[in-house]
Regions:
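Select subsegments of transmembrane alpha-helices in polytopic membrane proteins
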Residues: 37-48, 267-272
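Hydrophobic transmembrane alpha-helical segments in integral membrane proteins
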Residues: 1-11
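Transmembrane alpha-helices and immediately adjacent membrane-cytoplasm interface residues
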Residues: 45-109
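Polar-ligand-bearing catalytic/cofactor-coordination segments
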Residues: 14, 18-31, 80, 84, ...
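Final/C-terminal transmembrane alpha-helix of multipass membrane proteins
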Residues: 264-286
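Loop-to-helix transition at the N-terminal end of transmembrane alpha-helices
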Residues: 27-41
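Juxtamembrane boundary at the C-terminal end of a transmembrane helix
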Residues: 1, 279-296
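Basic, amphipathic juxtamembrane/active-site segments
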Residues: 179-188
Length: 296
């Protein structure tokens, strides 16, 4: 059962990284939603499989031999259980380090009242910091901030500057910080999973594309003006995510806005199929938990 559950998890994690470009172009926000669901399911299935294998190995140590009623749940044996236990320790340790770093980084990135120019814009604060470097990012929380540099604001036209601010607002509305953290967890704590890096990269690109579409709107002339502006800035400064990604984003803003509800049947079918198989495997395994309870 552990092998089947692990296979479901590996497939669910890898799926968003398999030919993601069509959905990144046509339906970036829906790509993010489906990718987060698939990755979350995959990570859960992988951890469940590793814990199940570790538990069977622990039972072997406790009783000093084979445990026939549950051995079929983890056929990989003692060495497999030991490897699973090591993987669990790795995942927990890396996740704890990542959570600590994310919390420290969030606190450090918030701009104090004495630095820069602070302007209130609805329920958030726009902060202009005194630097010529190209800087634009958000700080979520009870008092969200959009931080932008004086140099970037001076170089952008009014339309492009508004797009940048709306782009950052879209990140706040979409709670994209948590999705970005999920991508980081995937490529650090689950680094041993094939395709994890590709999926994490696709998810990050999807977050940027989704915010672009939310901010750009449907007016084609405005979209093309924005595309020219961010393309020029990306080539000049290589900011945020590299020149290639800036060019990819600007090329997709030249075209008309994608439909609000595209055809997602194939992607949804894949996520549903893997979810169903994983749930069935877990339910089948749960029917054999009585030996664990008998040892309590």
């Amino acid at each position: 059962m552990t092998l089947l559950l692990l296979a479901c998890g590996l497939l669910a994690v890898a799926m968003p990284g398999i030919r993601p470009k069509p959905m990144l172009v046509a339906a970036p926000r829906w790509f993010v939603r489906l990718a987060v669901a698939s990755v979350g399911l995959g990570m859960f299935a992988i951890v469940a499989a590793l814990l199940l294998s570790t538990s069977v190995g622990a039972l072997h140590l406790m009783v000093g031999g084979a445990v026939t009623p549950v051995d079929h749940l983890a056929p990989e044996g003692v060495f497999g259980s030991a490897a699973a236990a090591a993987a669990v320790v790795w995942i927990v340790g890396r996740s704890a380090v990542l959570a600590s770093r994310a919390a420290r980084g969030h606190r450090a990135a918030r701009v104090d009242a004495w630095l820069g120019k602070h302007e209130t814009a609805g329920d958030l604060e726009v902060v202009i910091i005194p630097t010529d470097a190209s800087v634009a990012y958000t700080i979520p929380g009870r008092q969200p901030q959009i931080v932008i540099s004086e140099g970037l604001r001076a170089r952008l036209s009014a339309d492009v500057l508004r797009f940048v601010l709306d782009h950052e607002r879209a990140h706040l509305r979409g709670r994209d910080r948590w999705n970005a953290l999920l991508a980081t967890a995937l490529e650090t704590a689950f680094v041993f999973v094939p395709g994890a890096a590709r999926t994490a990269a696709a998810l990050r690109i999807g977050l940027e594309r989704a915010a672009d579409e939310d901010a750009a709107g449907g007016l084609l002339t405005r979209r093309r003006t924005i595309a020219r502006g961010i393309s020029a800035e990306g080539v000049r400064a290589h900011i945020a995510c590299g020149a290639e990604l800036w060019q990819f984003r600007s090329r997709n803003l030249v075209d008309p806005a994608p439909p609000a509800l595209p055809d997602l049947s194939l992607a949804a079918l894949g996520v549903t199929a893997v979810s169903t198989v994983g749930v069935l495997v877990a339910l089948h395994a749960s029917a054999d938990f009585s030996p664990y309870l008998a040892l309590l």
